[in-house]
Amino acid sequence: MPEYEGNCLCKAIHLKAIIEEPKLSCCHCETCRIWCSSPFMAFSCTQKPSVSENENVGKYASSSFAERIFCKNCGTTLYFAYTNGKNPYFINAWLFKGIENITFDAQVCIDDKPDCYDFANKTSMFTVDEVMKSIVK
């Protein structure tokens, strides 16, 4: 399986992740939109990404079931992780260079999406309720 490498904007954090398939998904939930100033666009990853651990790695528990990992220095969004360790990790898709044949596959929390934008791509769409039911406890 292909392993990709990327950095945050200030290059203080180096990240490696195995991306099984370059299928892009995005989350329209309010928390992701505030976190990223847009929908969070990510690749799903079954293995925890390898991150150069240092004082710049920040973790924020955004809910009782998830945390968000970011660079404390430049603010780059790195990834979203369920705290149960069973669900996939969602890695910022734009950290990596050289990923080919990316497809826009899914939109989650579609019922939280504001009316002011739409993506033209045909994707699978999941509501907040469907996402919450899919989380392995």
From Swiss-Prot:
Gene Ontology biological process terms from the UniProt entry: formaldehyde catabolic process
Listed SUPFAM superfamilies: Mss4-like
Cofactor: Zn(2+)
Gene3D superfamilies linked: glutathione-dependent formaldehyde- activating enzyme (gfa)
Key words, A-Z: Cytoplasm, Lyase, Metal-binding, Nucleus, Zinc
Main location group: cytoplasm
Residue ranges occupied by any CENP-V/GFA domain in the UniProt entry: 4-118
Residues the entry annotates as binding Zn(2+) 2: 27, 29, 32
Family label: Belongs to the Gfa family.
Protein name (Swiss-Prot/TrEMBL): Uncharacterized lyase C29B12.13
Organism name: Schizosaccharomyces pombe (strain 972 / ATCC 24843) (Fission yeast)
Taxonomic placement: Eukaryota, Fungi, Dikarya, Ascomycota, Taphrinomycotina
